[in-house]
Amino acid sequence: MAWQNERIDQNIYSQGEVDKWVYSTCNICSVGCGCYTAVKDGKIVGIKGNGDHPINRGRLGPKGENQWYANNAPDRLTTPLIRNKEGTLEPASWDDAMNLIAQKAKQTIQEKGTNSISIYSTGQGFMEDYYTLAKIGRAGLQTHLMDANTRLCTATTEFCLLQSFGADGTPASFDDIDETDTLMLFGHNVAETGTVLFERIMDRKKRTGKPYLIVVDPRKTLTAKEADLHLQLTPGSNVALLNGLISEVVKNKQIDTKFIADHTIGFEEMAESLAEWPLEKSEKYTGIPIETLQLAAEKLGTTKSLVTTTLQGTYQSADATTACVAINNLHLIRGLIGKPGSGPLHMAGQPSSSANRTAGGVGTYPAHRNHSNPDHINEIAELWNVEAMTLPVGPEKGIEEHISMIEKGEIGLFWNIGTNSMVSLPNRQRAKKAMAKTFVVVQDPFLTETTAVADVVLPAALWGEKEGTMENADRTINLVRKAVEPPEGVKSDFEIFLDFAKRMDLKDKDGQPLIGFATPEECFEEFKRVSKGRPCDMTGITYERLEKENGLRWPVPDENSPGTPRLYSDFQFHTKPDDAQSFGKDQFSGRALTKKEFTDKNPDGRAILHPTRYLPPAEQPNAEYPLWLTTGRLVWHWHTRTKTGRSPILHMAAQHGYVEIHTEDAKKMSIVQGEMVRITSPRGWIEVPARIGDAVQKGLLFVPFHFGSWEKKEAANELTADFVDPLSKQPQFKQSACKIEKVRKDHKMASGESMEFIAEQYGLTVEDLKEANNLTSPYDIQMGDTLEIPLSIVNVPIQPYMPYRGKI
């Protein structure tokens, strides 16, 4: 059972009773908590958890409880903006803004060809938005340049699943976490990124002692502190760790030989790649003591059930897809997949990033179709009533490739939808410079760092002001009902896309409007027809069922289907050539394989085991930049704080960026708690206060990525490298080289000055000065001596939030 009891979390501001509660789903992380939106006098005034929803039983995380404040923010955009000749954004009508975009799109296609418009969307929209965008982009604009910020967070999910199983869709679900004996989290700080899921894990663990919890993370996160076993590895050594652990399992013959023989291919090649990976070698590269590695290997080799989860700590690391494929390999060689309590659960970060992949809003065609398979292209052409030869095909291009094309003058229009890319992209100064070379459209509810580089800004509706479906991390389709009208002058993403299609006069091959639906529900009904017979079949889903049954996990092939708690329970995988979503890629170079290369392997419905080669991160600490840098989330904020920064509660909990540094590293440099320091990498620098402790290992710095104004130099992505994984093309945010320096002022002691006097002048304490100068007494310094003055001592609170609040 998932929960011992329900607990209705509620955050509401209302004078008297609310007018109504509207069915909804949280729009923050990928857990997909059911909730109700409070409405009074036509405004959203609160939220409460849905006690009947199986995912959360009424619980909400701190971000989810406070998301509605953004709807009422006084700085909402309520009119389009167009940049004038003087370089200033000024108000414009919707007609003027949309006509300008349509005119620019037509001009770009005429001058540069069809593959010259880049559409870069989000993981926070609705399935209906993504499907509409996919149809407009591919069948209307004939562009293959469709990507989203999901490339930054969870692209590796898709590609590791394609490599191993032939199709997207994570095999396990949250239900399996409730049954498993062993839960292993790879780079997944669930206590801060998915607080309700963490509560669900801890609820069971406190009641039953299960699951045995293994956490793989270079930091001592809140999650790691609850682990039975914390594998605190060197940054970028995930594959080195997995190779050793899996090699040990194979060596000890703790594998399911019948499952391997009947349901997989490639075991010999995989085993050969691990032949020279004793645990001693893993110890060398990971820094984890061999005794700890032996304990982990024994647990993985003997557990009767196993769920693994992965998130950005793995996805944003060197050789991310190889690491996730190795995790799939582990499940396959032990036969722990498609069974209750077992399977890989490759997580998502955003509330609907999975839906963007499913609906075709990013690299692949809708409903997990293979753009390298002519039969699949013909299917979608028939469904859309367009000529197959007009649909763009070929390898998908990630956002970093889009930026390179912009730099070369190959992209004439960049449409940025629902994401603050000028803060979230790696090496952001490069991205900012590139935007000056193209026409930029930004679709967002607020002015952001990205609207600062826009030529046109479109004010978009927020959650609660529109209707549609989302897909969470475990394939559950959830419904969001519209609770209120958006502010006057604001349109939903869906409405904007329909408007654009009309102004572009997009037609099917019979001359009828390409977009034949007018509402989100009509759009969903069309997508159901597109999904029929595919791995993500949603034929049996309706809006009514989603509300009545509190979500359904695909596939749901007919109206009597209750949904599918886990995939591959029949051990039949999507690797038949006519079924596969992809023919795969070369595991090391990322080159797309041909249909013949795939067919020659003869997978025929069997899962594919791959060799896993360890390659160290492309950038490593050196003499000039001697420290590792990694980035990540805080429990209080979401992405770049566009929404959470407008909640007074969340903003006050974490108002500014900082850097975590190990106590010993700080002591060597006489850095004191809260003082301003400068972090520099080969790409840029930031100045943030120091948070000192043992949350990071020696030689590693951690900077949260939420903060990024152009005025304050505190954006983590001023520092991060833009190397990408060769298969998923996901940037490697988690490993960059950097250095840290004190930002201080020298003060020469004058006659009559005391340390107390100097401390008061700079707003410091005597203890601050003593610590910064390695003094034991205020009398250890004399007239003429020079004191180092640490600037801007800032109170950086040590994490006060307990994820499960002691009450689960």
Question: Model-found features: residue ranges?
Answer:
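Short beta-alpha connecting loops at secondary-structure transitions
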Residues: K225-L233, P459-A461, E465, T476-P487, ...
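Conserved short loop/turn motifs at secondary-structure junctions
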Residues: S118-F126, K284-I288, L311-A318, Q350, ...
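Long, contiguous, secondary-structure-rich segments that constitute the structural scaffold
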Residues: P487-G489, D493-D558, E624, T640, ...
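Extended redox/cofactor-interaction regions of prokaryotic respiratory oxidoreductases
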Residues: Y131-M202, G209-I214, V239-N243, K284, ...
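N-terminal export/assembly segments and adjacent metallocofactor-ligating motifs
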Residues: M1-N252, D262, P289, L293, ...
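Glycine/threonine-rich phosphate-binding loop and adjacent beta-strand/alpha-helix elements that clamp
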Residues: F174, E465-P486, I496-F497, A501, ...
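Primarily a LysM-type cell-wall glycan-binding module
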Residues: R744-E767, Q782-P797
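N-terminal leader/propeptide and maturation segments of large enzyme subunits in energy/redox metabolism
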Residues: K85-E90, N252-I290, H368-L391, V484-A592, ...
